[in-house]
A protein has these predicted regions:
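Repeated scaffold domains used in trafficking and secretory/extracellular systems
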Residues: 38-46, 78-91, 122-147, 176-191, ...
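Acidic, serine/threonine- and glycine-rich low-complexity intrinsically disordered segments
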Residues: 190-312
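Blade-level signature of beta-propeller repeat domains, shared across WD40, Kelch, NHL, RCC1
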Residues: 368-402
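C-terminal motif of bacterial Sec signal peptides marking the signal peptidase cleavage site
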Residues: 19-22
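Short beta-strand elements that form the blades of beta-propeller/WD-repeat-like
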Residues: 46-58, 85, 89-102, 136-138, ...
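A short beta-strand motif characteristic of beta-propeller blades
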Residues: 69-77, 111-133, 167-178, 207-215, ...
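Bacterial signal peptide processing site
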Residues: 24-27
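Intrinsically disordered, low-complexity segments enriched in Gly and acidic/Ser/Thr residues
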Residues: 284-368
């Protein structure tokens, strides 16, 4: 049974989130399987609006879910103490040196390109996937179809999970391959997956069978999936992997000629949108437009720690700067539009994990040292719309239901 309580909120409950999901694109996602279930799963209830929430894990592995509509909190159980987490907007993948624990928040959105479907099911902890070393996790834009990739650096094991099985409460590996230990990625792309390790990327069918020839990718790091395809960051470029005529296609997007700015090693966006952001350490923010196949460098006056491309009509780009502030940049010029007060200075000083996420209307930020979660209206002067003081310190969190 879920135990619900109300967190302390520092603004009136009338300031509730009215978040809308992203704008429709004219074509279907290139990297998703063709089978269309509208995200429906047996036992799930379809909703009239997204059931948005903040699902968090504290330092002891206790999992909580804050409902952003009624501000109640549910205790979802306990996983092993996390070292890192990843989320696709439904599941949280909590990694430590022994494997990955999977939490199903029970809320998700199905993007049908020209409209959306919203669902709620039972929230639960699904179990663990064993592996050596803190895994990197890669997901697609679907929480009910396709695959989820895990790469364990200690053993060099590349694992692809069946995401449809996850949506039914089961953990099923469709392949587990072994390459050289070290950094790596397993990136789902439709019914295929890319394994990035060493200095190359290989493509595989869902059963692990190699497909085609390897593609060079020096020092692979960072991945994200947009409506256009799956992105893998390389030292000199990004690889864009899409599925055309039921076959994977790899396209290289090189950094601009003559650029001396550091490459991006992580990417973030409003889920599914074609433009993604990455930090060019010490230089600013890289924007990668996967639809236009272009990079743009936005120089910044403040050192940037994280960057998120909202990719909305106003081309908003959100950054977390070294002073703990959230700043709103013009994605076309790099000009600063607004800035919050420093919110997470204590967490940054303590070396604690802080994460900035965004949807179409709001941004969210955790402060483990401050014991706070913030909702920020980035279109209204980076105003703090709501501030929550959860009972458990939010060491890691994700916005779920989107």
């Amino acid at each position: 049974m879920l135990h619900r309580s109300s967190p302390r909120s520092f603004l009136p409950t009338a300031l509730l989130l009215f978040a809308l999901t992203g704008c429709a694109a004219p074509t279907a996602p290139a990297s998703e399987p063709s089978r269309d279930t509208h995200g429906d799963i047996d036992g799930a209830a379809e909703l009239a609006e997204p059931a948005l929430g903040l699902t968090s894990i504290d330092g002891d592995g206790r999992v909580s879910h804050l409902d952003l509509l009624d501000e109640t909190t549910a205790d979802l159980g306990t996983v092993r103490a996390p070292v890192a987490t990843h989320s696709d907007g439904r599941y949280l993948f909590s990694a430590d040196d022994a494997g990955v624990s999977i939490v199903d928040s029970g809320v998700w959105t199905w993007d049908h390109v020209d409209h959306f479907h919203y669902y709620r099911a039972e929230a639960r902890i699904l179990g663990d996937v064993a592996g050596e070393g803190v895994a990197t996790v890669a997901t697609s834009n679907s929480s009910t179809t396709g695959g989820t990739g895990l790469f364990f650096p200690g053993s060099g094991e590349a694992v692809l999970l069946d995401t449809e099985a996850l949506s039914k409460g089961e953990i099923a590996e469709t392949f587990r391959l072994t390459v050289d230990p070290g950094p790596g990625l397993v990136v789902p792309a439709g019914s295929f997956a890319a394994v990035a390790a060493g200095d190359e990327v290989t493509l595989h069918a869902a059963d692990g069978t190699r497909v085609g020839d390897p593609t060079a990718c020096p020092s692979p790091a960072g991945t994200i999936t947009t409506r256009v395809g799956a992105v893998i960051g390389c030292q000199d470029s990004a690889l864009l992997i899409a599925v055309e005529d039921e076959q994977p296609v790899v396209e290289r997007i090189p950094y601009p000629a003559g650029s001396t700015a550091p490459r991006a090693t992580a990417f973030a966006n409003r889920e599914g949108r074609p433009t993604v952001a990455g930090v060019a350490e010490g230089a600013g923010v890289w924007l990668l437009d996967t639809r236009e196949r272009t990079w743009t460098l936005l120089p910044t006056a403040q050192p940037v720690l994280q960057a998120v491309a909202v990719d909305d009509r106003d081309a908003n780009v959100l950054v977390l700067t070294a002073d703990g502030s959230v700043r709103v940049l013009d994605g076309e010029t790099g000009a600063e539009r607004a800035a919050s007060v420093p919110l997470v200075a204590a967490s940054l000083a303590a070396g604690l994990p802080v994460n900035l996420v965004a949807d179409q209307q709001r941004a969210y930020l955790n402060g483990p040292a401050e014991d706070r979660l913030w909702e920020i209206d980035f279109a209204d002067g980076a105003r703090v719309a709501r501030e929550f003081a959860p009972e458990r310190s939010p060491l890691f969190f994700a916005e779920t239901g989107r």
